[in-house]
Amino acid sequence: MRVKMHVKKGDTVLVASGKYKGRVGKVKEVLPKKYAVIVEGVNIVKKAVRVSPKYPQGGFIEKEAPLHASKVRPICPACGKPTRVRKKFLENGKKIRVCAKCGGALDTEE
């Protein structure tokens, strides 16, 4: 089953609820099967790693953990506010994401 996501990699988002409410960051990765996103600088966890060629010291590393996608809202580049996403069809048949508040496009046209 394909899950429709309202955010894409590279979007600037606001965390709307939870422990990190109010924080703004860029989406590093989208995980549609888990309906989750990894946001830069948000939901930092400490992970124990064994000694390996990648981590010669071992010990603990800090990394971003996935955040449920319903907790984030994309920030509209036109109005600068966090918004819900609507879809709109263009004349050429392409579907783009649109800001629900101002109607500005969230996708850059290729």
UniProtKB/Swiss-Prot annotation:
One of its GO terms (cellular component) is ribonucleoprotein complex. One of its GO terms (molecular function) is rRNA binding. CDD domains: KOW_RPL26 (cd06089). SMART domains: KOW. Keywords: Ribonucleoprotein, Ribosomal protein, RNA-binding, rRNA-binding. Belongs to the universal ribosomal protein uL24 family. Part of the 50S ribosomal subunit. One of two assembly initiator proteins, it binds directly to the 5'-end of the 23S rRNA, where it nucleates assembly of the 50S subunit. One of the proteins that surrounds the polypeptide exit tunnel on the outside of the subunit. This is Large ribosomal subunit protein uL24. It comes from Thermus thermophilus (strain ATCC BAA-163 / DSM 7039 / HB27).
